[in-house]
């Protein structure tokens, strides 16, 4: 039975670090898929774009088609290996927040778990300010909290359409990273029995 875990978190929360460390420690052999990368690969194959930045400019209908292609590909991969899908629950746009996974995509992926990585707004803001390599939006602590609240609401909507369990993992500055990694490993290890 396919085992799919969706992992989300706003920029600066530590999602990539936690994911990398958890994948090194889990007993299950997960395949990590970045949903946006898979969509981009599909768009390049179809001759729609050459660069990642062009993705945002594609018509919404085309973007939805690319999302479905990516979801179907992930569903096929999940027949062989457990899959960890790195994606955004919500995406901040200049016009408002957009759901990262539309209804049809969630139904197709049918995740077992939706994991949200969170931290306090002040911790996230501090991490963003220290990470000068990344080009990130400047947000206030209030805006960061709103984005995290919207991610929780999106996760609930996704779970309603897939029967997934929601797991919120907190990644705090004071000894939080190790605890966060261990919590994710516990979830990932549940896949071992599915592929035995």
Swiss-Prot record:
Keywords: ATP-binding, Cytoplasm, Kinase, Nucleotide-binding, Transferase. GO terms for cellular component: cytoplasm. InterPro entries: Adenylate_kinase_AdkA, P-loop_NTPase. Its main location: cytoplasm. It is found in: Cytoplasm. The keyword Kinase applies. Pfam families: AAA_17. GO terms for molecular function: adenylate kinase activity; ATP binding. ATP binds at residues 9-17. It catalyses: AMP + ATP = 2 ADP. It comes from the Archaea. Transmembrane segments: none annotated. Its EC number is 2.7.4.3. The keyword Coiled coil does not apply. Belongs to the archaeal adenylate kinase family. NCBIfam families: PRK04040.1. This is Adenylate kinase.
């Amino acid at each position: 039975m396919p085992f799919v875990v969706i992992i989300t978190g706003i920029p600066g929360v530590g999602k990539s670090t936690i994911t990398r460390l958890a994948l090194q420690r889990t007993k299950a052999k997960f395949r990590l898929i970045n949903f946006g990368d898979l969509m981009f690969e599909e768009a390049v194959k179809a001759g729609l774009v050459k660069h990642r930045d062009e993705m945002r400019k594609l018509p919404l209908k085309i973007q939805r088609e690319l999302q479905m292609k990516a979801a179907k590909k992930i569903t096929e991969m999940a027949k062989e290996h457990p899959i960890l899908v790195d994606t955004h629950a919500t995406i901040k746009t200049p016009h408002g927040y957009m759901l990262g996974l539309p209804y049809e995509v969630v139904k197709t992926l049918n995740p077992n778990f939706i994991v949200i990585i969170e931290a306090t707004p002040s911790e996230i803001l501090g991490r963003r300010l220290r990470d000068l390599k990344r080009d990130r939006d400047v947000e206030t602590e209030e805006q960061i909290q709103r984005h995290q609240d919207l991610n929780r609401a999106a996760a609930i909507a996704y779970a309603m359409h897939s029967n997934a369990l929601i797991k919120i993992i907190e990644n705090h500055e004071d000894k939080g990273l190790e605890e966060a990694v261990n919590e994710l490993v516990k979830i990932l290890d549940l896949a071992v029995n599915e592929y035995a």
